């Protein structure tokens, strides 16, 4: 549903209207549009590739794209803001007709997307995993992955002569823009579509970005608080911490909103920022979630109150990550302290279940690089080795059915995971898994480090009993 007053404004199409997008990018655009003249505003259209967000999309559509964002500080101060940047909500269909039509319209200048690390289907060498059934189906013409959907969208855009387009990653994949571009090029080449590949090279930019705002899955409590504070019975409110950050590579081929007006940082090189965020925030978050689950805790902030879990996180960053990332344009010690303070926010109520998910993507993406760099410089990664050891213990709980919740992992091979934990030497089996470790798999240094980490984790667990 388009607001007529904004009908011909430049359009940003976002794929994935989940909580994070609505607490982050949509908030930025709302703030930008409020600060610029009407003629400089952009409109936001949202849709989805998969039919797994029907309730959210229906609620957004019923509210004309508007919804309430609740933010909360570590001190418990709550604020409420009605976000009005979404001008159109696309209905889902199996052929993605509305999504493709919108992205192929000349008014659309940016298509952005938020996917998990596994949603890129890339191995450690940035090669497409063509053995994955979804990707294999898309190579035959289906539209179930980001690549298949965007290939159809780009083909239609090229046919219409709709002009250049920016494809913008808004997620936690390291070097997301460059790696997505490599994946998209490989996908088109494997399809044998030389003409579309040439058009892509000449007409599409793919900026990298670092995004940050802790955004839990909404609960009914959020809706209740929103109603009490605003009087609005919002069917799709979203809640997040007060902290927000967005660092974007300045690489837009068809224009962009003035993101910096709302506080985004436009830079030539995102790499130092994303490395700090992925290793210090994302990996530490996973550490706390896995440890907290093993300790019988429910929320992230509870783990931060546990002296041993806090120490696991603090030592990992201080002893191993900061030396790996030095020198840096960031004050890494200060960043560490801010991150740990954010994790201790008891009002966000971020669950271990949410943060613990997708370990088979997080080990290679968030943790393995620090181990590899420690090995390369001759350092013993004592603190970092605790993190994969925690995940191995967590994986054993999953296999035995003792986790207190359903574990979600988009790329885990369940049979392979069970074979790891059932092996006579589960540490060696774990460290030999190439999906987790890539070129590190099977190395003696890795096995020894994780075995030592495992001993520390087991001693910690025994002391809690």
UniProtKB/Swiss-Prot annotation:
KW Oxidoreductase (keyword) present: yes
Species for this entry: Ralstonia nicotianae (strain ATCC BAA-1114 / GMI1000)
InterPro entries in the cross-refs: 6-PGluconate_DH-like_C_sf (IPR008927), 6PGD_dom2 (IPR013328), DalD (IPR050025), Mannitol_DH (IPR000669), Mannitol_DH/Oxidoreductase (IPR050988), Mannitol_DH_C (IPR013118), Mannitol_DH_N (IPR013131), NAD(P)-bd_dom_sf (IPR036291)
GO MF annotation terms: D-arabinitol 4-dehydrogenase activity; fructuronate reductase activity
Entry similarity comment: Belongs to the mannitol dehydrogenase family.
Enzymatic class: oxidoreductase
Protein name according to UniProt: D-arabinitol 4-dehydrogenase
Domain of life according to the entry: Bacteria
Gene3D superfamilies (alphabetical): N-(1-d-carboxylethyl)-l-norvaline Dehydrogenase, domain 2 (1.10.1040.10), NAD(P)-binding Rossmann-like Domain (3.40.50.720)
EC number: 1.1.1.11
